[in-house]
């Protein structure tokens, strides 16, 4: 019996170590302990798969334009996604505020942050009008909470270098093709509205009322054939709402 004791002890120690290691792996696995964590990991992976340089040519085009037509500093920068990019009359509508339209593609908030130095900070704007986050929810599957957190990061970057710049967040506007995401849009708006209320020089522009009927239904006639982007009627309703907010 004495001859086999060391071997038995060794086997017992190996077995115990194996159980401990496996237990730690599965106990620490989000999939095993929290089903919702699996969804969070999946969303994070999709963000990681977004090429932050996919709009490099669009941003470069802005820089080429600036070289030919240097904009005045202290202006109002409109930055965000395709809602601004498709608004071809934006700079003319807000010419008296020195509007600079820096909307690009179907960008997300992380992409706006990525290019913030080149599309916002370099202009040293007096105001920044921000519209992004809808693609984060509709395309990346982000939650309203995540969108709010990312907007706070953007504010931190801008105010870190330009503390006297006013930042205006235009409320997330749900499109007909994204009605299934309406609850996350509402949650994001509620969180960002509260953040704007308590943060100096950060303001919330609510365009939701002009986009809906009295009974709450979305005015689908304000959107183009793709049922995603606004048409001229939609932009026309935004102009007085934005102008009123910027005048305060």
Where in the sequence are the language-model features?
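Bacterial N-terminal signal peptides that target proteins for export
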Residues: 1-11
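Bacterial N-terminal signal peptides
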Residues: 9-21
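Conserved SGNH/GDSL esterase-like catalytic core that processes O-acyl groups on lipids
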Residues: 44-153, 176-186, 190
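Sec-exported extracytoplasmic/periplasmic mature domains
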Residues: 117, 121, 133, 156-163, ...
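Charged, glycine-enriched surface loops/patches
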Residues: 147-170, 187, 191-202
């Amino acid at each position: 019996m004495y001859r086999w004791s060391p071997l038995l002890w060794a086997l017992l120690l190996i077995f115990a170590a194996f159980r401990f290691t496996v237990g730690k792996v599965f106990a620490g696995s989000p999939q095993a302990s929290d089903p919702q964590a699996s969804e969070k990991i999946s969303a994070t992976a999709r963000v990681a798969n977004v090429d932050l340089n996919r709009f490099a040519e669009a941003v470069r085009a802005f820089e080429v334009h600036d070289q030919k037509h240097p904009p005045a500093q202290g202006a109002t920068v409109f930055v965000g996604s395709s809602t601004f990019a498709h608004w071809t009359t934006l700079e003319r509508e807000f010419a008296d505020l020195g509007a600079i339209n820096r909307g690009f593609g179907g960008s997300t908030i992380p992409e706006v942050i990525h290019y913030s130095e080149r599309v916002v900070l370099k202009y040293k704007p007096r105001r920044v009008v921000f519209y992004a986050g809808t693609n984060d929810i509709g395309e990346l599957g982000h939650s309203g909470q995540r969108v709010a957190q990312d907007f706070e990061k953007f504010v931190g970057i801008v105010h870190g270098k330009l503390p006297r710049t006013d930042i205006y967040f235009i409320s997330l506007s749900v499109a007909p093709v994204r009605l299934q995401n309406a609850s996350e849009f509402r949650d994001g708006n509620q969180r960002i509205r509260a953040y704007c209320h308590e943060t100096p020089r950060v303001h919330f522009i609510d365009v939701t009322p002009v986009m809906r009927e009295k009974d709450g239904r979305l005015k689908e006639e304000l959107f183009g054939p793709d049922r995603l982007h606004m048409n001229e009627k939609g932009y026309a309703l935004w102009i007085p709402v934005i102008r009123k907010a910027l005048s305060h």
